[in-house]
Structure formats: C-alpha cells, structure tokens
Design a protein with these regions (language model features):
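Protein kinase catalytic-loop region centered on the HRD/HxD motif
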Residues: 131-141
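Activation segment of protein kinases
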Residues: 156, 162-196
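Conserved N-lobe ATP-binding subsite of Hanks-type protein kinase domains
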Residues: 36
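Conserved short submotifs of the Hanks-type protein kinase catalytic core
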Residues: 92-106, 110
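Activation segment signature within eukaryotic-like protein kinase domains
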Residues: 125-126
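AlphaC helix of the eukaryotic protein kinase fold
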Residues: 55-76
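Activation-segment/catalytic-loop signature of the eukaryotic protein kinase fold
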Residues: 88
Length: 286
C-alpha cells in the first residue's frame, strides 16, 4: 500500500536481527546512496530475499519517489534476466522492497578491474544483459545505470539486471520534483547524450559497450576525474581496442566502437543487434 509522500522517515539505522514486516534481517549485503540492502529471511516461508530499505538518515521526497518507481518497474518487468520483485510494503514509516536473492553476488566480483577477459568468457554475460535491456526497451524503459555493480548472478550463475532506481521511460526527461532537468547515472558508463540529460535506449547500448571494452582490456576507455571523463566522452574518440589488446580481431573492435559512437544514430538499431553482432564475430576468434 502506498503511503503519502509527506512527513519524516528518519528512524534508527536497520541492523541484523531486526524484523521488518514479515522478514528477519540476517546481515547487510551492501548500501548505496539512498538505500540499504540486507539478506533477509521470510518468517513463515523461510525464503531468503534481498531486502532493500530506504536510507532513513535521509528525509528526501525524491528518494522516496525513486524507491517507489523502482518497485513498480520491477513488478512490471517480468524477465528471466531482470531481478524479480517479490514484495513492496511499509513497516511503520519505513518502505521496503523484497527482491530475489542473488547468491552469486555481482559480476564485478567475477570480472575484476585490471584483469583482461577473453571474449568467449564474457559473451554469455553480454548476451543475457542485452536480452534484459531489449525487453526493458520494448516496454519503453531505459535503465540508465548499466554497470558491474548492477549485474547480479543468480543461483545457477544466470545474469540478473538490477537497480532500476533511476530508470526512465522513453521520451521523458529525468527531472527533479522542482522541474529541473536532472543528469543521472554513473559517469564512467554514461553515453554523451545521457551526460547532456537526454537518455535514449541507445544510451544503455553505449554503457554495455563500455563494459565490454573494459572487460576485454582490463580498464575503461577513459580515466580520470568525473569531470575529465565527461569532457573526454563528449569530445574524444575512445582509444582503439587493438592498441591495448592486439589479439582482438578488427571486426570485434569495429562492432564495439560502433556501439560507442558519440552520435546515438550511428550505433546499432537495438542493443540486442549489438550483442548478436558480437556473438557472430566471436566465431572467428575461437
């Protein structure tokens, strides 16, 4: 049930052993800018879940709206490669979202920064992410924050795309509650048009291509402060992959750089087309 977006949401920080709704908090899995995530167990079903609780040290209307939007989107997007929403409720003034628990952690723990990965190892992950993104795009949703921390691994090592907290609908512009246009995302993976405040479905394709580049090379195409990366992303072509990893085929390099074109109209028509082209090109690298 939705609560009014007024009043104070500040209470003590959640801790292991506490009960929230019908869930017992076991231990913290992580925390972000606006929420804590706990491994929790349903008191009656004994089902393990990832329980996301709004960061109650904040009292911000926009964070609460974002939390509710994420819950609604996850409930609508039913796909095998998107994390499942199981429940959304309130414990007093505390909103919480129960999601399927990903025992494999995040892909960040598998493809570690600084370690180049073979194309054939990352390809199954790329295809699963692309299918999840394509499904979201077909339902008029742009994820806007594709990055390793938001790619989870389920019980059979399958990929789950998570964190739709800053997702937006196609054709709308992210704005604050005061009507100001807002730039959201993680600079390291943001497309030029997203940096300008106008994300498109092609922005998710760009972010996925940056991930592929990073995994193949062991590092991002651009580095430095967020401001420096922004300027490079808007004005400088990414370094060629083959300069860093000569074993990568010219075809694979061309596909990845096409998906990273600064003009979104020059990228692939759909994110799944990018992943499919990469799969086809990989046959020549066996």
């Amino acid at each position: 049930m939705e609560q009014p977006l007024t009043g104070s949401y500040v209470i003590g920080q959640p801790t292991s052993g506490e009960q929230v709704g019908n869930y017992l908090l076991l231990h913290e899995l992580g925390r972000g800018g606006y929420a804590h995530v706990f491994l929790a167990e349903h008191l009656y079903f004994k089902q393990l879940v990832a329980l996301q609780l709004l960061n109650l040290s904040l009292n911000q209307h926009e964070d609460l709206v974002r939390f509710q939007v994420e819950a609604r989107l996850l409930a609508q997007l039913q796909h095998r490669h998107i994390v499942r929403a199981l429940n959304f409720d309130w414990e007093g003034d505390t909103p919480f979202l129960a999601m399927a628990y990903a025992p494999g952690g995040t892909i960040q723990q598998v493809f570690q920064q600084g370690t180049p990965q073979p194309l054939l190892r990352i390809l199954p992950v790329v295809l699963q992410i692309a299918r999840a993104l394509q499904y979201a795009h077909n339902h008029h949703i742009i994820h806007c924050d594709v990055k390793p921390e938001n790619i989870l691994l389920g019980p059979r090592n399958e990929v789950w795309l998570a964190d739709f907290g800053i997702a937006t609908t196609i054709g709308s512009l992210p704005r604050t509650s005061y009507g100001r246009q807002e730039i959201r995302g993680t600079v390291r993976y943001m497309a030029p048009e997203q940096l300008r405040g106008t994300p498109l479905p092609a922005s998710d394709q760009y972010a996925l291509a940056v991930l592929v580049y990073e995994w193949l090379c062991g590092g991002p195409p651009f580095s430095g402060t967020d401001i420096a990366v922004c300027f490079q992303r808007l004005s400088t072509p990414p370094p060629r992959l083959r300069e860093r990893v000569p074993s990568i085929s010219p075809t694979v390099e061309r596909i990845i750089l096409k998906a990273m074109e600064k003009d979104p109209r020059l990228r692939f028509a759909h994110v799944l087309e990018f992943a499919s082209a990469l799969k086809k090109a990989s046959l020549g690298q066996r």
